[in-house]
Amino acid sequence: KYAVVGFGTAGYHAVKKIRELDKEGCIDVYSNTGRAPYNPMLTTYYAFGKLEYEGMFPFGDLEQIQKEVDFNLRREQVIKVHGSEHLVETENGSEQYDRILIATGARAFAPPVKGLEPEDAFLMRTVEDALRFKDRLKKNDIKHAVVIGASMAGIKVVEVLHKYGIETWLLDLASYIFPLAAYKEVAKEIEKRVEAQGVHLMFGVTIDHMEQENGEKTAVLTDGSRIPADIVGLCIGTRAITETVQGEVEIGRGIVV
């Protein structure tokens, strides 16, 4: 009897492999999203309009996946995994298993920004994030935007905003774009191309707080600069979701294996 906690891409592939190795075993998959597994990097493509909604779900819909792989989907929030007891505790009770796999993934990380209204703050990782972002863009009430984080997700959000004709600033505390993914020489070439599209780049700086006066919203930066900002995209990074196994396994920036 197997339990898989989390049903993103990793959870999906784990379930497929378990079923391949054990044709008869019971597999319970815990997921509180109610959605098929999806690729978080595809959410910006949907927001841009390059993908239809279904395109975010590369493995098909839930009904199709369940039919192909044969598992039980339990739409419950897992509260705690008790490793020594082989127990999964949920909001509705608990269940014992022979083997438990943790595939909870990560969530977007965003520190609070003083003065930033919730309706003007946008993350970009989940399907819900993409739907919310797209709905706001349809209102045509955004003239200026600030995106924090010169990451892959950040530049894709900038691309979406640029498509809608929104004047956009991309900020990062690092000294150049894609600091974790590109050599400085390559990054500088990318920066030239991004700026050629009319995007403003600012490095070594981030947002300090938001101010609003007479309906005009302004992002005040850590160097004192002031930028008009109707919305703020927070693409700073992710944090591993480890709450369910706290105290049960060794945890660093994620689960240590």
Language-model segments: residues:
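Glycine-rich dinucleotide-binding loop and its adjacent helix/turn
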Residues: 104-164
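FAD-site-proximal beta/loop scaffold in flavoenzymes
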Residues: 117-138, 218, 226-257
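A conserved short coil-to-beta-strand element within the FAD-binding core of flavoproteins
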Residues: 75-86, 203-215
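Core beta-strand elements of the Rossmann-like FAD/NAD(P) dinucleotide-binding domain
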Residues: 90-99, 222-231
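Rossmann-like dinucleotide-binding cores of NAD(P)H-dependent redox enzymes
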Residues: 144-145, 152-211
